[in-house]
Amino acid sequence: MRLSNRRGALRVLAAAAALCGAAALSSQAAHAAPDAHFVLISHAPDSDSWWNTIKNAIKQADEDFNVQTDYRNPPNGDIADMARLIEQAAARNYDGVIVTIADFDVLKGSISKVTAKHIPLITINSGTEEQSAQLGAIMHVGQPEYTAGKAAGEKAKAAGIKSFLCVNHYATNPASFERCRGFAEALGVDFKSSTLDAGQDPTTVQSKVSAYLRNHPDTQAVLALGPLSADPTIKALKQMGVAGKLWFATFDFDTDIAKAIQDGTIQFAIDQQPYLQGYIPVAVLAIVKKDHTTDPVKIRQALEANPKFQARLSTYGLAPSYGARNIGSGPGFITKENVDKVLKYAGQYR
């Protein structure tokens, strides 16, 4: 009898434990369920590792705000493919959509299918604040490209530079030319005659830069528009024996650029703080969903008051700039003086 009672008691305890375990798992599953489902669609090809920082930022924003964000991009960087991805996003009825304005004219029709369904829209990275407003976005998060180019050009002008080569690895993106134009107008020269459509193959970029500099020996400076053009240009300058002699600046950042800043090949990198372009739009859409508001002022207040967001900024040494409607992620400048701090998180969060 005692054995039977013990067995019965054990069965009861086992059943109770199973129920408690099931309840705990159910509670965890409920807690883990995301509050919203967003998508970020970029123009970047798979080969562009610069976007890894943005992908990492998306993951951290998802964690901090308990949401899920898909990342989509055209594998080869084809804008027509990007347009189709946007149309697919509209059809899937996401809780929010984030897009780059790689080509306003090509993408506006696809983006209109998102806003026609009253799906909250944020634009990032490429494009202008004016284009963002025309598309019906809540806000734009990015770096004003012309302003950034001009700021870099003013530094070049102060160094006595009067001529330059703009190495454009993404000429299919109209916004990319704003960087060249801003730099050129700071110097007082024509950007069209100074811009090289270099393509994205590293060997081709290196070859084209070398050929241009041989054919234009009076060129005093080089401006690269990102790692895909900067890294091969570094090799070209070193191979030609002019590294450190030719004034050289670039947009964006990676470990090769960091080394070139440290050894004097590159004067500075124009930092658009890409982490902010991944984190902030996800955070904004989460606030829109939770607080039922599209008011930029209220969204900014909620964002700035969020301790998890502030902790991320402090850890990675980031500083957004806030406008009346939009949030700026740059430009900042990475030089010999601050490159070591940035390098600590390069390729991951900087």
Regions of interest found by a model, annotated:
Residues Q68, D105-T147, I161, D254-Q262, ...:
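Flexible loop/hinge segments that line or gate small-molecule binding clefts
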Residues L40-S42, N93-I101, P120-I124, L165-N168, ...:
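Periplasmic-binding protein-like
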Residues V99-A116, F183, A198-A260:
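Hydrophobic alpha-helical
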Residues H37-F65, D70-I86, Y94, T100-F104, ...:
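Extracytoplasmic "Venus flytrap"
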Residues T69-D95, S194-H216, A230-P232:
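Structural motif
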Residues P34, A186-L187, V284-R350:
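Hinge/cleft segment of the Venus flytrap/periplasmic-binding protein
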Residues S49-D64, A148-A152, P174-F191, K208, ...:
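Short, solvent-exposed amphipathic alpha-helices that sit
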Residues M82, M139-F164, V205-Q206, F253-I257, ...:
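Hydrophobic alpha-helical segments within soluble ligand-binding/sensing domains
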